[in-house]
Amino acid sequence: MTDVPVSRLRNFCIIAHIDHGKSTLADRLLQDTGTVAGRDMQEQFLDNMDLERERGITIKLQAARMNYTAADGESYVLNLIDTPGHVDFSYEVSRSLQACEGALLVVDASQGVEAQTLANVYLALENDLEIIPVLNKIDLPGSDPERIKEEIEAIIGLDTSTAIACSAKTGLGVPEIMQAVVDRIPPPADTIDKPTKALIFDSYYDSYRGVIVYFRVISGRISTKDKVLLMASKKSYELDEIGVMSPDQCEVNELHAGEVGYLAASIKAVADARVGDTITLLNAPADEPLPGYTEAKPMVFCGLFPTDSDQYPDLREALDKLQLSDAALKYEPETSSAMGFGFRCGFLGLLHMEIVQERLEREYDLDLIVTAPSVIYKVNMIDGQMLMVDNPATLPDPQRRESIEEPYVRMEIYAPNEYNGTLMGLCQERRGEYIDMKYITTERVTLIYELPLAEVVTDFFDQMKSRTKGYASMEYHLIGYRRNDLVRLDVLINAEKADPLTTIAHRDKAYSIGKGLVEKLKELIPRQQFKIPLQASIGSRIIASESISAMRKDVLAKCYGGDISRKKKLLKKQAKGKKRMKAMGKVDVPQEAFMAVLKLNQTS
């Protein structure tokens, strides 16, 4: 099955913004090449997780090998590597691009170029990939292929005279795409005689065989009897099996340079076979690994607590298992007086956080409370030390710290130009600095802003979508840290600090956030038998307060008339009981209260 000469191999991926029809096109290619029989076909074939199908997004990378007979009568092997399209998973995209020689750039013929497409195109150009523009959804009444071609030329600078118009849904134009892959994407370099190197572009955990690693052989060859060495983790393994995905796994004896396949070697955790790592042979290792390997760094942090403290061991086990298949997830134990035991987790971004939370609740049947997300702050101490703080509750006291720096991102927003004003207003509200504005076409504009990551991770995306009726798209990347006048905003419920509600805010916005927060808590926390004071404070200064009045039982109901001193005695007894209750009582804070912290930026 693998005796195909290198000249007849093609490795390519599909680049597209969310919802532009990437998974549908992948389905169509699998069907047209007979890789998947019609009866086995289901929509979004390569999106294996239920969550992926429901949200209509690709999270984990998939790969498929297709046999195709071209117009010249030769049979070719096409390896399609599916990529995620969301900004959180851009590292996964960059690695899958490294495993390819070409890419199909799929653009919705009615919507045009979106931010995420652009980010991935730049990654593809950095990797010197041959890019074939494809205009999808041309069967829709609103499609305007000529305008979109102009847009692609204006924004990306690609020649669109050979762009292929298609409809992945009806199959129109798909044969032309297949032929273009063969004609225009170069074959892999013929490096079978060089030392063996293979790039890991994905891995997932299989409970029976351990970690299954997807890789692309860059040079040399790998066969079943080899012992392999992973160069970044310095671990060696004996291979149990190697094979190709077509799209179900199919065992083979050997893979050579240019081919894409999988291997199983009883690897215990995904962290041992990191994406981007280089596989080489143990007895004849390569001199140096392939370039570009970096460990995925979490950008967004939040606390995860089980609603029932008995579930804490289950949560630990679930996170351990998730980490086996998601090496970007980081976590450590955390305790809080208000919430009990839980974990502080780090994620690539907000979508990644939501997906992990949803997978924990779905696949492991856990009830979770999630605290507001925060970012990593750099704190410069008076004694010259520098601390990295990812949990607002652990921020040192003002007397000990000299300054706080927060991460900034450079953001590009693509939108129709009638939404210019509202988008600029949104960026201004979020402490954004205006950098530039470019007109791509007469109707579409690019806004470039630099803003604090903390302002982006809450609900910036939702706000942007709702203000532009869903037409805007954005892309951002980290540009470094900047010093700002930041303060720690504590929330006290019944004179007790609620750590999970602590946030770090800019001094100018602290008052409105604090006021909004206590007002929101007043609505959300149920009334108790005693009065609950709610306060927002910066250090020892209370900047906003509200109180939830007590529920009152009428103790005088049974005194019809009677002596006033009797009534006073009963009221005094009630007041005494309430005082004791207040000293002893614990206030349960509902999950909505923690999420309220997130939503406050809308109003502040």
UniProtKB/Swiss-Prot annotation:
GO terms for molecular function: GTP binding; GTPase activity; ribosome binding. One of its GO terms (cellular component) is plasma membrane. Keywords: Cell inner membrane, Cell membrane, GTP-binding, Hydrolase, Membrane, Nucleotide-binding, Protein biosynthesis. GTP binds at D19, H20, G21, K22, S23, T24, N136, K137, I138, D139. Residues 7-189 form the tr-type G domain. It is found in: Cell inner membrane. GO terms for biological process: positive regulation of translation; translation. Its EC number is 3.6.5.n1. The keyword rRNA-binding does not apply. It is a peripheral membrane protein. It comes from the Bacteria. It is an enzyme of class 3 (hydrolase). It catalyses: GTP + H2O = GDP + phosphate + H(+). InterPro entries: EF-4, EFG_III/V, EFG_V-like, EFTu-like_2, G_TR_CS, GUFP, LepA_C_sf, LepA_CTD. Belongs to the TRAFAC class translation factor GTPase superfamily. Classic translation factor GTPase family. LepA subfamily. Required for accurate and efficient protein synthesis under certain stress conditions. May act as a fidelity factor of the translation reaction, by catalyzing a one-codon backward translocation of tRNAs on improperly translocated ribosomes. Back-translocation proceeds from a post-translocation (POST) complex to a pre-translocation (PRE) complex, thus giving elongation factor G a second chance to translocate the tRNAs correctly. Binds to ribosomes in a GTP-dependent manner. This is Elongation factor 4. It comes from Prochlorococcus marinus (strain MIT 9313).
